[in-house]
Curated annotation (Swiss-Prot):
Listed name of the protein: Acylphosphatase
SUPFAM superfamilies: Acylphosphatase/BLUF domain-like
Keywords: Hydrolase
Domain (Acylphosphatase-like): residue spans on this chain: 7-93
Pfam families xref list: Acylphosphatase (PF00708)
Length: 93
């Protein structure tokens, strides 16, 4: 039996709006087989919600914290929980 899916909620701070960050995140998440979304917020942060296997979510978190993202990431505040919401695909909001 496989482990249950997890939910990664990551608040990405920095220069991450208007630079293709949500599109880039969507591409990486889909490559990893994750579902969820990336959404701009009025305060300049991007909220990333990803669901799927823990290893894939951890890889996405590493990518979000890495130096290959569009723009400039100052910090990522991440929270882990059980996947309870039914989300299909990965969208930009």
């Amino acid at each position: 039996m496989s482990a249950p899916d997890v939910r990664l909620t990551a608040w990405v701070h920095g220069w991450v709006q208007g630079v293709g960050f949500r599109w880039w995140t969507r591409c990486r998440a889909l490559e990893l087989g994750l579902t969820g979304y990336a959404a701009n917020h009025a305060d300049g942060r991007v909220l990333v919600v990803a669901q799927g296997p823990r290893a894939a979510c951890q890889k996405l978190l590493q990518l979000l914290q890495g130096d290959t993202t569009p723009g400039r990431v100052a910090k990522v505040v991440a929270d882990w929980s059980q996947s309870t919401e039914q989300i299909t695909g990965f969208s930009e909001r």
